[in-house]
Amino acid sequence: VGPDDLAPLFPMSLIMQEVSGERYLEIPGPVRDIYKQWRPSPMFRARRLEKALDTPAKIYYKYEGVSPAGSHKPNTAVAQAFYNAEAGIKKITTETGAGQWGSAMAFAGAFFDIEVQVFMVKVSFQQKPYRRALMESFGATCIASPSDTTQSGRAILEKDPDSTGSLGIAISEAVELAAQRDDTNYSLGSVLNHVLMHQTVIGQEAIKQMEMAGDYPDVVIGCAGGGSNFSGIAFPFIGEQLRGGKKIRAVAVEPAACPSMTRGKYAYDFGDTGNLTPLTKMHTLGSSFIPPGFHAGGLRYHGMAPLVSHAKELGLVEAAAYHQTPCFEAAVTFARSEGIIPAPESAHAVKGALEEAMRCKREGKSETILFNLSGHGHFDMAAYTEYFAGTLEDKNYDEQALSSALEKLPPVAAS
């Protein structure tokens, strides 16, 4: 795949970032100006949580929920909107799971006078009406996916009229529309190299903030669906390690119901269900795999970012998977100690941090743990209501469906 192959979907500036070999790229002034609304985001030491857990570990968290959209997603949405506006693009199509990315792109589009059309995974569209309202408040249109507005969506609905959707399906719908018009581009909220690069502002700030605290992490943790917030916090620390700095453990925490890194295959696959994207080598459950519905909609993606996947293959990244109930349990423990309600996605990182803290307690080690609290859960209270009512289900993926999806991987995957 060359730059010209991606030109129907992305501005050339982002395509060149995708293939860049530069260590650093300057953040444009207009993007920096918008970042100033919430960046640098705060880092806290979770002393009350440490006390509640009675752990010798020191726990720090970087809080990305202070952004106007409530998550880390505007870090790349603003940059992508800027480069698209610079290229004369009038409309952006995109997908969203839980609505965090759609909200961020809607927010960014408003700043650069770009129309935004969001395909929201149907199960989240139904679960999170206030996320839809937030997108519409910023001027975006929001459509439940799969929809009858695209050929990709209609094909899915023909097979399964009750389909709850997936990020892979929503991507297909957004890509299909973007490819049809010269004034329209597609925008992706995770997975791609340039998206991960934009998010490293998180970890770059975290390194400076740890210096201010006179500390440095032994373990760096982030939740992982497509890999953008995990790489945002972890990659700068991994980079320091590769350049001779302190060795860390980087732990990506994924949902047990959609475990691309802990259960998937490292192979070439499509990034979407409709097979409209280029093939990418990544940890994948198969592009035709539809995960069961669960509340961390932003983590319901069949694949993992190629860079995160490669880092895991090199032994630079570890992966852990948890069901949603223990993640909500961890989130409530965190909220009652630190006063912040984590998003269901971020709750996976909280769970990972608590597991590491309890390991330190068992082993009598005073390690330093840093995790990325990627967003707040103010629009996800229905999920917490289910948790408190005891009706939250830990759904397992269908083993037969997974095997079938892996068997359908493109032939190149076997090479």
Regions found by a protein language model. Name each.
Residues 1-89:
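Positively charged, low-complexity intrinsically disordered leader regions
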